[in-house]
Amino acid sequence: DFSLSRGLGDVYKRQEKFLPKLIRGIKKEGINVVWSCDPMHGNTIKSTTGFKTRPFNDVVSEVKNVFAVHQAEGSYAGGLHVEMTGQDVTECTGGAKKISDADLSSRYHTHCDPRLNSDQAIELAFLISDEIKKNSLYSKSAIKAAS
């Protein structure tokens, strides 16, 4: 398992440098890896209200960007690490409920890192599903041909 925790800014800045070169190098060496994306840790910020948080839109953008890089390189994003809870917390900003910095204090229950709440986690799952459907590398015929 090869997990990348870059942060949105790094992924965008290095989209055409870091990750593609890494993918090409691993492929060239013939090493089999499972590429895993960690969009949480690199996108942790301090909110204007002083809470440690993660902007949901940055998490989503990083996931989409990682999928795009893998698509361009003929590779697969095979795993995703997210911190989430089934509780209705307000620890990460954004999402369908548009949690703002001002909302964070209402249900901020984490003892360590901010987690996606259940709605944000489901929203992310559907967005990932859409990315997989768009990506021809993940089609049944492509997977069958690769095996």
Go through each PLM region and give its residues.
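Basic/polar N-terminal segments that are highly enriched at the extreme N-terminus
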Residues: 137-147
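Single conserved hydrophobic/aromatic residue that forms the stacking wall/gate
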Residues: 1-8, 12
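Catalytic-face loop-and-helix region of soluble metabolic enzyme cores
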Residues: 10-133
